[in-house]
Amino acid sequence: MAEPNQHYEVIIAGGGIAGVTLALMFEKLDISYFLLEGRDTLESDRGAGIGLQPNGLRILDQLGLVEDIEEATIPLEKWFSYDSEGNLMNDSDAMGQYRDKIGYPVAFIERRKLLPIMVRHIQRTECVKTSARVASIEESEDHVTVTTTDGLSLTADIVVGADGVRSAVRTHIDSKLPEPLTADDYISVACSTVYGMSAPTEGIAPGERFAVYRENQTVIGFTGKDGIVFWFVFENLNRNVPLSQAPRYTEAEAEALCLSVAHTQVTPKLKFGEIYKNSVVAVKIGVEEGVAKGWHTDRAVIVGDAACKTTPAGGQGANQAIESCAVFVNKLMAARKASQSGDKLSSDVVKSVLASYAQERAQPATTALERSQMVGKALLCTPGPATTLVKDMLKLSNEDWLLRAFMALSAAPYLEDVELTARGHLYNKAVEEARAEMARRQRVAKEVKEAEEKESKQAASIKESEQRNEFVGLRNPVQAATGVVEVGS
């Protein structure tokens, strides 16, 4: 264990996906840190599956994790979409092309498998303390002091809250705002879900995904390596419940929700009830969502779910957490390089780093939240534009689907001070080609629109001329008939 009185550049509160990602980034770039985790281990068995997409995997590849992750996963390749009557709306294999076209697949992995993979890569194990929750945070002009529930006191230049939706660091930040807030002011629960895992089930193969568009209750699922099925049953609460009042559910309530969709068709040869019969995990929770109002103080900042909590329907929660870590580290590294070698960052520079990070991540976080809400509303067939838009996307060709997907990934950040792998460069090439193709399509669409407008104006002009001639003819019947102008007309 590191000496308790040692000063660090960064204290990380939280040892989940975001916290461990930060630790690995700091080790890669020689940034001193200390990580505090409230549970008794970093290798938690809580939660079910985690979706990893190209934007997150590109960063994990920079950290040397992707090969290990791919050994434990299988890419998603086939996607079935059904309506509430069991009619197949779409079956697409566009996702199966991600690996070859953009360098990384979309894959699902058990949380209890992903975290151990990541934790094995931590070298400075003496800088990690479990069973240590943040009890208090005190900021001064030149450092921040973090005290844990077991009495440990540490100082650092910055404390980063990677401590989830009920973040102690965010609570500290909220208390320092000009108008203090609580999480209830921006995080709520609008639906519940049973997250589950099932043993391999006949009728759904590894690499297949399903989604059902159904009012009030619906189900989505993914298959991972060895046929393990990860699934979510969603229920619309038809109201927004503040975080502090988020409902807690029993096993009986979880079972009741799952049985309500047991008859639902999820693949051509399978109904959800068969998957549920093989379940090994089935836990019902309220699904929190929201973006924090304040992301930082002078020496405290938040990343991951502490800053932006989205629903599982969007499939970007872990990936957005990884992105936020990369942006924070990029800002910190830029400040370090700009300062004189070996000099501690001044208070003003630290403030600038945190403010710049928060400013850059605020809009992507809001966009991620809006997209996850849109997908959730569409899955539950909530009337409105979201349902129409998502269902229209199901009609896209593979080419158009990939173009839109790659455009959505085109602005994703990565670690600027760590070399990209060959796959990372392929990612960049793919999004540049997507940008060029989108620009070409927009240019063509503009030219077509301009041509149509020109043609419309010409047609209107001709019609106006014809109407004018008809009017003249009615006023001068002799002239109209003979072409002779009457004297005095």
Curated annotation (Swiss-Prot):
Factors inducing expression: Expression is repressed by glutamine and at alkaline ambient pH and highly induced under nitrogen starvation and acidic pH conditions. Expression is also negatively regulated by vel1.
Transmembrane segments: 7-26
Pfam families noted in UniProt: FAD_binding_3
SUPFAM superfamilies for this protein: FAD/NAD(P)-binding domain
EC numbers, comma separated: 1.-.-.-
A molecular-function term among this protein's GO annotations: FAD binding
InterPro entries the record matches: FAD-bd, FAD/NAD-bd_sf, FAD_mOase_fung
Biased composition (Basic and acidic residues): 448-469
Listed pathway(s): Secondary metabolite biosynthesis
Binding site for FAD: E37, G51, R111, D305, A318
Compartment(s): Membrane
Catalytic center residues: Y213
Keyword terms: Coiled coil, FAD, Flavoprotein, Membrane, Monooxygenase, Oxidoreductase, Transmembrane, Transmembrane helix
Residue ranges that the Swiss-Prot or TrEMBL entry lists as coiled coil: 427-470
Entry annotated with the keyword Nucleus: no
Main localization (coarse): membrane
Topology of this chain in the membrane: Single-pass membrane protein
PANTHER family: FAD-BINDING DOMAIN-CONTAINING PROTEIN-RELATED (PTHR47356:SF2), FAD-DEPENDENT MONOOXYGENASE ASQG-RELATED (PTHR47356)
Function: FAD-dependent monooxygenase; part of the gene cluster that mediates the biosynthesis of bikaverin, a red pigment also considered as a mycotoxin. The first stage is catalyzed by the polyketide synthase bik1, which catalyzes the formation of the intermediate SMA76a also knowm as pre-bikaverin. FAD-dependent monooxygenase bik2 might then be responsible for the oxidation of pre-bikaverin to oxo-pre-bikaverin which is in turn methylated by the O-methyltransferase bik3 to me-oxo-pre-bikaverin.
Family to which the UniProt record says this protein belongs: Belongs to the paxM FAD-dependent monooxygenase family.
Protein name: FAD-dependent monooxygenase bik2
Species name: Gibberella fujikuroi (strain CBS 195.34 / IMI 58289 / NRRL A-6831) (Bakanae and foot rot disease fungus)
Underlying gene: bik2
